[in-house]
Amino acid sequence: MAAKVADDVANLKLDDSNTKPASGAAENGDKPTGDAEHEDSDDDNEAEEGAPEAGEGAAKKKKKRKPRKKKKAGAAGAGGAKTQTAPPRVRIDEVFPNDSYPEGEIQEYVNENAYRTTNEEKRHLDRMNNDFLTEYRKGAEIHREVRQWAQKWIKPGMGLTEIAEGIEDSVRALTGHQGLGNGDAQIAGMGFPTGLSINHCAAHYTPNAGNKMVVNYEDVMKVDFGVHINGRIVDSAFTLTFDPVYDNLVNACKAATNAGIKEAGIDVRMSDIGAAIQEVMESYEVEIKGEMLPVKCIRNLNGHSIGHYTIHGGKTVPIVKGGDQTKMEEGETFAIETFGSTGKGYVRDDMETSHYAMKADAPKVALRVSSAKTLLNSITKNFGTLPFCRRYLDRMGHDKYLLGLNNLVSAGIVEAYPPLCDIKGSYTAQSEHTFVLRPTCKEVLSRGDDY
């Protein structure tokens, strides 16, 4: 049969006068590329279907193909999902249209809690927790996308206000809630203001209006921000440096935080977690300007439990040994954050206050300053017990509010959180993750490829 086919092919003759090249490239003897062949497939099929008319090919012209349009950033992909932009501006529920967000890092319980991994009753309880876990995972995915962009975007010489607003605008864009209407910021958005604490300042620093500070190449900057979805707060922080001389300081905090998370679990005592953290942290040292310095835990800073709309839920997780014998419990959410320092390892209040939060158990007292009443009404509607900063009040159009704000603080209704600093000339670093104690495992919600 093969011989017959060969003979038939040999007898075939092409009428060159009636045959026209498909394209200019073919006329010139050039071979089409693989992509061109792929794109031409539809046209080839059309040509085959219209075979009777092909004999009149000399009289007819082939249709010109329209060039394919390139997809824009943020355009819909497979299944209607969009891709994220830089800076992040596509709502996260458009990137994950089915509301199915990635799980955090799963860590199994060990020792006396190992049975929880396979226990059927615990697995049933775990399946019942999907609703609130979806909200946590959504917030965690927003945190990951924003911080991964921020780590590439932040450069020496940038102003702190520009950095803070860049992060916060991205979080608000991804949640789809700008926080300008009454109550909008309580649906989703910032879990607390973006902390940008530099060098000896360890925590609670964000720029107020008019701040001219910039981050320099030789600085060590802690970037700490939270994302919340319906009051489920994901709290995570990293330390940003440009000079590799500080790598050991940064790595000490990362390793200590991971040790704390590994030790944590249902019925584990806080003191045991603190001991595990301190052992790892203080095994590091860092050489700065020719001097070898030990890395110390900042002993009066702690991790904490996280409540609904409450960043500090009542339990503290120490980062040094001894002390608190309180146990962790099933279903609780914690932020383990560790701070390392080349200074004294002890912080105090310093610099201008920027962070505030209304107390959950705020007393009902008569306010003598009229601006305090107006401000309290706005804080209650827009933030509730979520922390806020002065820039947020400026953004909402409040003017000349400082007297009223100080009145709310002195009345015990609002708590002020001043920056926390070690001795000048020292360097501090931070690492933090949020995790939930599920019935069958620990889920490190904020874990990402970056840290």
Curated annotation (Swiss-Prot):
It catalyses: Release of N-terminal amino acids, preferentially methionine, from peptides and arylamides. One of its GO terms (biological process) is proteolysis. Residues 1-101 are annotated as: Disordered. It comes from Pyrenophora tritici-repentis (strain Pt-1C-BFP) (Wheat tan spot fungus). Residues 60-73 have a biased composition (Basic residues). It holds the Pfam family Peptidase_M24. This is Methionine aminopeptidase 2-2. InterPro entries: Creatinase/aminopeptidase-like, Met_Aminopeptidase_Type2, Pept_M24, Pept_M24_MAP, Pept_M24A_MAP2, Pept_M24A_MAP2_BS, WH-like_DNA-bd_sf, WH_DNA-bd_sf. The keyword Metal-binding applies. Keywords: Aminopeptidase, Cytoplasm, Hydrolase, Metal-binding, Protease.
